[in-house]
């Protein structure tokens, strides 16, 4: 391309600045998830951005917008009753001969390393509404997951 057809600003490749993606669907939260979201918003609001470089301040403001949106759209789900797997339950299951325990939580609260999975995750969707002793299909395998136990989680 001829230099005559280039703008000086073409020399700088600027990455587009997008908002942080909001997960589709409802923003269900546990009591713990709502508390953590409020704490995150408060912590971000307490940070003085006036001393930050412009890019750092923009990133901070984008993060704050995300968490304010998540707080505004949060739907606190009631503590589940009954024996079935539901949002806000601690589930012990057996998969491939190994027993594991997870808590089914909202998207922002999910952390598989801590045993917290989102209600939109494939495993949570597969075991939803199952009761102890039931086997459910998962990963293309029939009866792959056996539900061992279910307990409501009030606030962890």
Residue spans of the language-model regions?
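Helix-rich terminal scaffold detector
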Residues: 1-71
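Short glycine/threonine/proline-enriched tight-turn/helix- or strand-capping micro-motif at secondary-structure
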Residues: 71-78
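Non-DNA-binding regulatory cores of transcription-related proteins
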Residues: 78-148
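Short, compositionally biased
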Residues: 148-156
């Amino acid at each position: 391309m001829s230099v005559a057809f280039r703008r000086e600003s073409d020399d700088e490749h600027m990455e587009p600045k997008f908002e942080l993606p909001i997960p589709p669907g409802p923003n269900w939260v546990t009591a713990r998830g709502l508390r953590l979201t409020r704490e995150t918003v408060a912590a971000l609001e307490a940070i003085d951005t006036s001393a930050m470089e412009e890019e750092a301040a923009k990133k901070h403001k984008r993060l704050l917008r995300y968490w304010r949106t998540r707080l505004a759209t949060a739907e606190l789900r009631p503590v589940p009753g009954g024996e079935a797997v539901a949002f806000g339950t601690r589930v012990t299951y057996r998969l491939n001969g190994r027993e594991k325990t997870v808590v089914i939580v909202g998207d922002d609260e999910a952390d598989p390393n801590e045993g917290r999975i989102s209600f939109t995750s494939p495993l949570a969707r597969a075991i939803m509404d199952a009761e102890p002793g039931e086997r459910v299909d998962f990963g293309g395998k029939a009866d792959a997951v056996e539900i061992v136990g279910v307990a409501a989680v009030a606030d962890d």
